[in-house]
Curated annotation (Swiss-Prot):
GO terms for biological process: intracellular potassium ion homeostasis; intracellular sodium ion homeostasis; potassium ion import across plasma membrane; sodium ion export across plasma membrane. It comes from the Eukaryota. It is a single-pass type II membrane protein. One of its GO terms (cellular component) is sodium:potassium-exchanging ATPase complex. It comes from Tetronarce californica. The sodium/potassium-transporting ATPase is composed of a catalytic alpha subunit, an auxiliary non-catalytic beta subunit and an additional regulatory subunit. Glycans are attached at N114, N159, N194, N267. This is Sodium/potassium-transporting ATPase subunit beta-1. Disulfide bonds join C127-C150, C160-C176, C215-C278. The lineage of its organism: Eukaryota, Metazoa, Chordata, Craniata, Vertebrata. Residues 1-32 are cytoplasmic. Belongs to the X(+)/potassium ATPases subunit beta family.
Amino acid sequence: MAREKSTDDGGGWKKFLWDSEKKQVLGRTGTSWFKIFVFYLIFYGCLAGIFIGTIQVMLLTISDFEPKYQDRVAPPGLSHSPYAVKTEISFSVSNPNSYENHVNGLKELLKNYNESKQDGNTPFEDCGVIPADYITRGPIEESQGQKRVCRFLLQWLKNCSGIDDPSYGYSEGKPCIIAKLNRILGFYPKPPKNGTDLPEALQANYNQYVLPIHCQAKKEEDKVRIGTIEYFGMGGVGGFPLQYYPYYGKRLQKNYLQPLVGIQFTNLTHNVELRVECKVFGDNIAYSEKDRSLGRFEVKIEVKS
């Protein structure tokens, strides 16, 4: 006769969950569970303490106003407005809708340069009307409230200011673009030491307090088609004046206005796509084939009749 299979499983999983005889939950008494809880509480508490401590030590070595390591920061890039998709500005003189986005881009950039926002009890100060030397305002590390910033008057951009022509020349087929150097904290741009190494068009107007900018046709055959290019900036100079540098960062100069240069193409050949390259010149301005915006930018312009 076959032996009957024992059906006694010792209580099974129910007894494992709660053993009333031994007063155990999941195989452990209350005292055992308490010891385990205290152990892990202390263990993870120590881990959290070590983590928080290392973070605190690291924060003590970091300035609230200046990055600790800046040796790999590249020289500033040169950017422009209006921002164009695939760097292409294409519009029709007879169709205002075709250049509406370009005009709105310029308005968005220049709205902070309105004179009303630079008047009254503000951190702005007059730094002259002609280019001058750097204006230093103490160490970056010190926090003494907001540091003063130089005013930049919209009227200096003349035809590209939008004051007299709200279309910035687009309605007449004479488009404007606004160039600016990207902000780098604590950067002192160095102008060319002399004008002999500059393009011939810049040599006559060399200024020791300005980083000049120059635009020209990318292709030799486009030089005649591009025609005359006019530059508008502080003191009538097409470049970036030194008194707006160095930049102290958003925490100390949240109202900082970087200098701008208005560039207007006054007699472009219509119905032809023209490729233009603009470069800023300085002793510590670099250019790179890998980064096409480093010290320069390219833009394609097509004015349709």
